Amino acid sequence: MKTETVENWLIPMGDVSFFLNPAWRAVATYNCKGMGFSTFFPENAVGVVEAKKICEGCPVQRICLEFALQNNEDHGIWGGVSERTRKKMRQTRERHLRRMAKVDAQLKQLAQ
């Protein structure tokens, strides 16, 4: 079974300024110019590979991926990553955030 790894995909929590700026979408739209909508919502493995190749080297690839993660996009290729991998990434992030919340609560208790 093939797995995919995405390095450095986390954008600092709370920093959503890039989502508010429509420029990233304009860059993505320009880079994807001429690609049909269905290109990024492929129906077979060949289409998935092709969509991922389009995302390689895109200057807003990480932002596109983070947008999909933040908005729970369950379909399509976003930032060169499949829905299955994004689901795993969200689960990992959620576990990490739960652990951080526990540590934070323990530190607050110790500080009292």
Question: Where do the protein language model's features map onto the residues?
Answer:
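Short, surface-exposed, polar/charged, turn-prone segments marking secondary-structure boundaries
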Residues: P59-R62, A68-Q70, R86, D104-K108
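Short Fe-S-cluster ligation motifs
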Residues: M13-S17, A26-T29, V81-Q112
